[in-house]
Amino acid sequence: MTHIYNTAAFILMLFCCSCMNVDTRGQAEAWKKVGIDLSNVDQDGLRGPADGKVAVSYEFCIPDTPEHRAAVRAIDSTVQFMPGSRGRIGASKGQCLCIGSTQQKDYKAVLRSLSNLPYIARIIECYFE
């Protein structure tokens, strides 16, 4: 009898999983917002020669409100807010320039989560010029 219940539960689980709709196209579109070459960045978020690895800084802009800052801070613990600065990204009036770093745990997941926010149009490398 237990075997029948286990089999039924397994079939039900397979059916439920097959009905799940994962929006991979939307995630791929969001990832296009990230204009940073991460191919040479290691798992620690660093790139460069073994004796001179450095983190990659990136920038983006958000609406300049406490709510938007809190949402971004909840995703990216490295973020620094630079209200009034335009950056290379070209933050406009009413927007806040944000600068983050790949030197954090799961930096790719952080960038993916940021790119999924509808109010972030682009994320580019920051060169501090």
Language-model segments: residues:
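Bacterial N-terminal signal peptides that target proteins for export
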Residues: M1-A8
